[in-house]
Amino acid sequence: MTGLSKDIAQPTSGAPMVKAEGVHKSFGLAHILKGIDLVVNPREVFCLIGPSGSGKSTFLRCINHLEKISAGRLYVDGDLVGYRQKGDKLYELKEKEVAAQRRDIGMVFQRFNLFPHMTALENVMEAPVQVKGETKAVARERAERLLDRVGLGDRKGHYPAQLSGGQQQRVAIARALAMQPKLMLFDEPTSALDPELVGEVLDVMRDLAEDGMTMIVVTHEMGFAREVGDSLVFMDDGLVVESGHPRDVLTNPQHDRTKSFLSKVL
């Protein structure tokens, strides 16, 4: 799979693709994110690792305002996510404005969340037609091209139940790309797959990286992080514990918590 660059929206502001400043998130009394500061640059593959419950997936969901942050600021391509600032005050955006921001952000979940009553092709066409108002002809042409790119051109008429888990996840990636996002968020995209199916999904993500897609990837696939990642953050207990180039962090961790975690997964 190559040649996806025409389906990748380019950043427009000259700002970092993602910037988090003191991001906190609480659910009731549970303090999940405890002051996250990080920067993701355009075209970067940014990997988040850490134990379950460390806040990785919650942070990912905050980036596109599926979860509202409790304090701090989150920016995507220079735009404040979910809010408008006037003076010192923040005003929450209307749902229509939030939806417009989300159009630039593709998200791929652990579970594929495909519409079971739609074919692979229809799943990929749905959002461009319903959300962006594209004609079916335009949406179909892009959907067919994207399914070809993820190696499923011969499965476009299949329903999700007729596809393997790896094939369903590749359809989900094509569906996210159909909106021509400038940023892709991957929340443990291989964790629900049988081991023999993991490689085909990682191959698609590797090709996306080569085509210049900015990606934030929550993953337990340390080999992928080492080979493809540009930056890596280890999170634990809602905090960024350690960050750096993946090879440096994975081969020479500096923090005891990072060392303990990696000793169990490598």
Residues of each region from the PLM?
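ABC family nucleotide-binding domain
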Residues: 13-246
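Short, low-complexity, intrinsically disordered N-terminal peptides in bacterial proteins
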Residues: 1-13
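C-terminal boundary and immediately downstream tail of ABC-type ATPase nucleotide-binding domains
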Residues: 2-4, 234-237, 243, 247-266
